[in-house]
Amino acid sequence: FNSNMLRGSVCEEDVSLMTSIDNMIEEIDFYEKEIYKGSHSGGVIKGMDYDLEDDENDEDEMTEQMVEEVADHITQDMIDEVAHHVLDNITHDMAHMEEIVHGLSGDVTQIKEIVQKVNVAVEKVKHIVETEETQKTVEPEQIEETQNTVEPEQTEETQKTVEPEQTEETQNTVEPEQIEETQKTVEPEQTEEAQKTVEPEQTEETQKTVEPEQTEETQKTVEPEQTEETQKTVEPEQTEETQKTVEPEQTEETQKTVEPEQTEETQKTVEPEQTEETQNTVEPEPTQETQNTVEP
């Protein structure tokens, strides 16, 4: 058994122990050789050979056992040292790895914050771009709507703000036909008030300016039969009285029924504005009253 095979992987203490064992084995071999070479009695030596062989076998077994024990001890120590060294390295590496992981986690959080900021900035840019696009697309529509909505308002305001001079000029330039139509469309309340406020002189003139044709027709439409019957049945005395009483009434009526020549002259002298107003405001009631008063 050669113990030099283990020297490459054994510590110094184990190496010194193994060298001492080798020295002991060499000494034993040396003494054996000298014993066999010496001039001692061969019988004693031969008798002892059997014992020596047994002792050598025992020594070999002992050495083998010792070597095995030493090897086991050395290997166990080596295993323990290696394991301890490995564990130390592992623990150191783990601690270092924890620091590295902690640093990496901090870096990751910073990266996440940066990414969030970038996303927010991108969203803001997108929003700005969208608003600009919508403003570009909406501006012409709003302009058209505002023009459509502002035009009638401006027209109304301009109509209201028309200078009164222009309105007066337009009123002066209105055709007489429109004036007559407006006079005809005057409300009945105003016509009634105007009729009430008409001076009595004008009413007399209007009565005088009543068409002579109507008065003549009313006189002609008086029933001749009634007049003849009344004249026949009335006594002569009553006829005289009735003639006396009727004469002033008829004279008044005849005054109203002045010849058409005079009425035409009076109509010519009447102002055209008053004639138009009076013709429009004349009610049918005075004609009926005149018809009633004309009857005998």
From Swiss-Prot:
Keywords associated with the record: Malaria, Repeat
Highest rank taxon of the organism: Eukaryota
Sequence repeats, residue ranges: 132-143, 144-155, 156-167, 168-179, 180-191, 192-203, 204-215, 216-227, 228-239, 240-251, 252-263, 264-275, 276-287, 288-293
Biased composition (Polar residues): 277-296
Biased composition (Basic and acidic residues): 181-271
Stretch list, region 13.5 X 12 AA approximate tandem repeats of E-E-T-Q-K-T-V-E-P-E-Q-T: 132-296
Region of interest: Disordered: 133-296
Translocase in keyword set: no
Protein name: 110 kDa antigen
Organism for this UniProt entry: Plasmodium knowlesi
